[in-house]
């Protein structure tokens, strides 16, 4: 790869830039791959409600850990009585039942139970009280609880994903930064602009989001409060400003800037706005991401001749190369436990794939069957990865379980969707 190609790569990836077209329409969930064998779980329609059970069923299916049973179910299940023998005969080990009841102040009580057929006991027996406007959110919370009860791992169905859209149908081909549920439902627009919006990055409390905007005709990093809509400029230095990433305590931000001529990584103290230059060489250093413990960060650099992932330690200011397999490794992001890196990987002679590298062993496993993949982002529990890809000429988001058992697509009917970022919990 020539220096010209590497610089082009840095300008695109340090800012997360992808020139594509997208629509404002809601994303539509499409199952691309389902697990061949997974424990069955029956989600019985809830009493007085027909909206909750399909959401829970869909959530658990797309985890890759379970397969919902929806046909020829025993009719004896209710919130008060479950006949274990009927479910044993049907070969279904887990059953979810529930009901919805009106409560005061335009709210609802959602009572749900998770039943272990073999043990003949309830694993969950809970009541949620939610406003009428949050019944869908309650369904995702039920999915989270069921997933944790059966796997011991916190569920991420009630989370959110940020992404960037561009609508080619409008005269100015407008960009929007949107946030939606992890199944693509309930999209909300954070910002709309005729100029590119790139590299969304959540603050650790998920109350604010940073992004790169070209509204002044040059890249600048903004921080926007999601509740109030208020925003402020964090970085608008001469040249490149991109790839923001927040420290686990939310007090600092790493970003790429070329104010001194070469793309380097800087750290900003968000209370004082003081800068510290973290890299200083002739290479292109970009895409910094803090480790979960805040003691180091990973980044992409071409200092070895091709884009690879490196780690910088705050303790001794040392830098260590992490990736050695493949001609290209970039856009690294760490799992919440700090053990794995999801990255864009290109084996020699192949297309760009999302892969997961175990940091302790250095083993890189290609995760995705698609090509031209970019922008991987782990779910908070580390069990799923969302990324942008193409299927034919269609640009879309895809979510895949890290064991490769399940994949779903989130396309827009009228355009393309890019730059996903999974919100922290």
Swiss-Prot record:
Q: What InterPro entries does the annotation carry?
A: 6-blade_b-propeller_TolB-like, PD40, Tol-Pal_TolB, TolB_N
Would you name any one GO CC term?
A: periplasmic space
Single GO BP term: cell division
Please list which residues make up the signal peptide: 1-25
- Key words, A-Z: Cell cycle, Cell division, Periplasm, Signal
Q: Where in the cell is it found?
A: Periplasm
What's one Pfam family here? TolB_N
Which PANTHER family does the UniProt entry name for this protein? PROTEIN TOLB (PTHR36842:SF1), PROTEIN TOLB HOMOLOG (PTHR36842)
Subunit info? The Tol-Pal system is composed of five core proteins: the inner membrane proteins TolA, TolQ and TolR, the periplasmic protein TolB and the outer membrane protein Pal. They form a network linking the inner and outer membranes and the peptidoglycan layer.
What the protein does comes down to: Part of the Tol-Pal system, which plays a role in outer membrane invagination during cell division and is important for maintaining outer membrane integrity.
Protein's UniProt name:
Tol-Pal system protein TolB
State the species of origin: Acinetobacter baylyi (strain ATCC 33305 / BD413 / ADP1)
């Amino acid at each position: 790869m020539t220096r010209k190609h590497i610089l082009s790569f840095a300008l695109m990836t340090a800012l997360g830039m992808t020139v594509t077209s997208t629509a404002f329409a809601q994303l539509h969930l499409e199952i691309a791959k389902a697990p061949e064998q997974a424990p069955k779980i029956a989600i019985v329609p809830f009493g007085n409600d027909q909206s909750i059970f399909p959401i829970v069923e869909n959530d658990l299916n797309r985890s890759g850990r379970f397969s919902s049973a929806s046909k020829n179910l025993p009719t004896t299940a209710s919130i008060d009585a479950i006949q274990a023998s009927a479910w044993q005969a049907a070969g279904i080990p887990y059953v979810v039942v529930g009901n919805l009841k009106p409560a005061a102040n335009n709210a609802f009580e959602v009572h749900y139970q998770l039943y272990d057929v073999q043990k003949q006991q309830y694993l969950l027996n809970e009541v949620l009280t939610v406003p009428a406007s949050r019944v869908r959110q309650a369904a995702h919370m039920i999915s989270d609880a069921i997933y944790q009860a059966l796997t011991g791992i916190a569920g991420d169905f009630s989370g959110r994903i940020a992404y960037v859209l561009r609508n080619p149908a409008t005269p100015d081909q407008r960009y929007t930064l949107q946030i939606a549920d992890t199944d693509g439902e309930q999209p909300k627009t954070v910002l709309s602009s005729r100029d590119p919006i790139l590299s969304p990055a959540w603050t650790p409390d998920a109350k604010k989001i940073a992004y790169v905007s070209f509204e002044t005709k040059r890249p600048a990093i903004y921080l926007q409060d999601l509740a109030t809509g208020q925003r402020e400029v964090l970085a608008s230095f001469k040249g490149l400003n991109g790839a923001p990433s927040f420290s686990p305590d939310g007090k600092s931000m790493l970003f790429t800037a070329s104010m001194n001529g070469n793309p380097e990584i800087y750290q900003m103290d968000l209370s004082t706005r003081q800068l510290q230059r973290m890299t200083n060489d002739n290479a292109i250093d970009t895409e910094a991401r803090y480790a979960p413990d805040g003691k180091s960060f990973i980044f992409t650099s071409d200092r070895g001749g091709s884009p690879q992932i490196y780690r910088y330690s705050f303790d001794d200011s040392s830098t260590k190369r992490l990736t050695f397999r493949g001609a290209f490794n970039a856009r690294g992001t760490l799992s919440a436990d700090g053990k794995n890196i999801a990255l864009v990987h290109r084996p020699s002679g192949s297309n760009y794939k999302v892969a997961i590298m175990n940091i302790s062993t250095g083993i890189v496993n290609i995760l995705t069957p698609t090509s031209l993949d970019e922008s991987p982002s782990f779910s908070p529990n580390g069990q799923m990865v969302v990324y942008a890809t193409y299927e034919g000429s269609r640009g879309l988001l895809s979510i895949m379980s890290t064991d490769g058992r399940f994949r779903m697509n989130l396309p827009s009917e009228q355009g393309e969707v890019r730059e996903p970022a999974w919100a922290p919990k």
